[in-house]
Amino acid sequence: IAQINPKMPRTHGDGLIDVNQINYAVEVNDEIPELPIIDLSEQELAIGKNCAALIENGATLQMGIGAIPNAVLVALQNHQNLGVHTEMFSDGLINLLETGVVNGKLKKVHPNKVVASFTVGTRKLYDYIDDNPEIVLLDVAYVNDPSVIRRNPKVTAINSAIEVDLTGQVCADSIGTRLYSGVGGQMDFIRGASVSEGGKPIIALPSITGKGESKIVSFLKEGAGVVTTRAHAHYIVTEYGAAHLYGKTLRQRAKALIEIAHPEHRERLEMEAFERFKTLN
């Protein structure tokens, strides 16, 4: 059974269906649900700038969903020859494509194309991808395959977190035992980026919650799910900077993460880290 809607964008890729596969068709003329663009806060813009500083010219980008990935895209106006291989295509990419910042010419897999598995955004986005051969939407099982992801150069995967502990464990799907969201493709792209030549897996998050609680914590909440293990954590970014964790001891990691925590929480985190590790040297 097929629903035919002229307001639905026609996308290139492997989503085409042969008319002979359709038994029944229903015609509608409904508006497509939109995700409005929200103004970015100074905190989010700072996080985006810190992430952008880690992104090299010629990198292949994967961005998660939300304000922080959009803030990263805003900060990439002066980059060159970027490519995109991502789970989700969002409004923030349009300007980078129109200005040539994103052209995909250095990609090894699907060069000169933006590869994604789904898209959500405004009507402008849907109109942009409509019958646009530069945008290719492919099966998520292929797009998120680490063995495919790694083949592109300098894959830089930017994903979010709910909280990160002082050893680098990343919780991204729950608040304690309460599920908050799905894990999405975080594990796939963090791994794919880590084995890409010159790749950089990045976890980006605000230093505090809206209630002022630190999102960098000594221990994850009881029952919290670890989506990215500390063995796979490379870069953690907040509005206060970036901590490079890969190859460092747990003590060195704790010290680096405290340096990018909110200033109001650093002294307490230092005391808790010292209690746990006895030294931060």
What are these regions (language model features)?
Residues 1-281:
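Conserved phosphate- and dinucleotide-binding cores of soluble alpha/beta proteins
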